[in-house]
């Protein structure tokens, strides 16, 4: 098995390359907050030498409650993305939920994300594939790791082979997620880059009745465990005031902890990727 390398400008994304950070905020709350968070990430990752892609959503279409904040919408969101891209010279990743969003989003954003709940929607997969953008596929909480090959095949047959696979936890009874570390290794066997979404994996879906709960206090332990597998990337979300974030605050890393957190993740990644592989199947 060879590791596929995805090129994003000067960034190389592959399971045997130094990890790439996909990080930012859950949903765009305001232009000013997005700029503040992007600036912090840009400064920290440049200092630590970590390749970086800014992440935020313009619309959270799958909130638990109809009254929950969803975001500024695509038109306003893309304006904010353009400003972040030009100000900080950062590549961007965001998610789409509808076929008609794919083309306009791909004109601004470098990586388009297929949400976990929508990963089997063929029309959306085809529309995303046809943009030619790099695709980040969130593994649904209800699918086994080996079933991701079917989604890969859909993208391939629609003409797109620039695919990353993202683990964000598996359903474990009601209102709980667990991370299958061996499952991530199984996804690595496809050769495609595997990304670990360490913050969403901390969710307790529906754990606060009308919104998701989370286990922010375990963010470091979970991410270190995932990085020990030797992955292509880490996906995290941070907020300067997680307790008052408009979405997924219970999972968000406090922004002031970002440098310490990433210093540890880089140390784990560097160490693991310095080892010679051991084939214990023989």
Curated annotation (Swiss-Prot):
Write out the annotated subcellular location. Cytoplasm
Which InterPro entries does the record associate with it? Answer: Aldolase_TIM, DAHP1/KDSA, KDO8P_synthase
Give the EC number(s) listed in the UniProt record: 2.5.1.55
Reactions catalysed? D-arabinose 5-phosphate + phosphoenolpyruvate + H2O = 3-deoxy-alpha-D-manno-2-octulosonate-8-phosphate + phosphate
Keywords, comma-separated and alphabetical: Cytoplasm, Lipopolysaccharide biosynthesis, Transferase
Q: What is its main location?
A: cytoplasm
Top enzyme category: transferase
Q: Does the keyword Cytoplasm apply?
A: yes
Any single GO molecular-function term of the entry would be:
3-deoxy-8-phosphooctulonate synthase activity
Please name the pathway: Carbohydrate biosynthesis; 3-deoxy-D-manno-octulosonate biosynthesis; 3-deoxy-D-manno-octulosonate from D-ribulose 5-phosphate: step 2/3; Bacterial outer membrane biogenesis; lipopolysaccharide biosynthesis
Keyword Transit peptide assigned to the entry: answer is no
Q: Which GO terms describe its biological process?
A: keto-3-deoxy-D-manno-octulosonic acid biosynthetic process
Query: Can you list the GO cellular component terms from the UniProt entry?
Result: cytoplasm
Q: What is this protein called?
A: 2-dehydro-3-deoxyphosphooctonate aldolase
Source organism per UniProt: Shewanella halifaxensis (strain HAW-EB4)
Tell me the gene name.
kdsA
């Amino acid at each position: 098995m060879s590791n596929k390398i995805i090129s994003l400008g000067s960034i190389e994304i592959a399971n045997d390359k130094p990890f790439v950070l996909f990080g930012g905020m859950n949903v765009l709350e305001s232009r000013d907050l997005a700029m503040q968070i992007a600036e912090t990430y840009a400064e920290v990752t440049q200092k630590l030498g970590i390749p970086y892609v800014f992440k935020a959503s313009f619309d959270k279409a799958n909130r638990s409650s109809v009254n929950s904040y969803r975001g500024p919408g695509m038109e306003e969101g893309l304006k904010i993305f353009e400003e972040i891209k030009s100000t900080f010279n950062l590549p961007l990743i965001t998610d789409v939920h509808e076929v008609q969003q794919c083309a306009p989003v791909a004109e601004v954003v470098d990586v388009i994300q297929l949400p976990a709940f929508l990963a089997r929607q063929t029309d959306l997969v085809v529309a995303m594939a046809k943009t030619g953008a790099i695709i980040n596929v969130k593994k649904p909480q209800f699918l086994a790791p080996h079933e991701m090959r079917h989604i890969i095949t859909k993208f391939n047959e629609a003409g797109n082979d620039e695919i990353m696979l993202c683990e964000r936890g598996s359903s474990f009874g009601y209102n709980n997620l667990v991370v299958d570390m061996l499952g991530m290794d199984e996804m690595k066997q496809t050769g495609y880059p595997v990304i670990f979404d360490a913050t969403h994996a901390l969710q307790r879906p529906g754990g606060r009745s009308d919104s998701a709960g989370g286990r922010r206090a375990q963010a470091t332990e979970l991410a270190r465990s995932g990085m020990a597998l030797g992955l292509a990337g880490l996906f995290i979300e941070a907020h300067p005031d997680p307790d008052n974030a408009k979405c997924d605050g219970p999972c968000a890393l406090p922004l002031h902890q970002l440098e310490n957190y990433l210093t540890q993740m880089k140390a784990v990644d560097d160490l693991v990727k310095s080892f010679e592989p051991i084939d214990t199947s023989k």
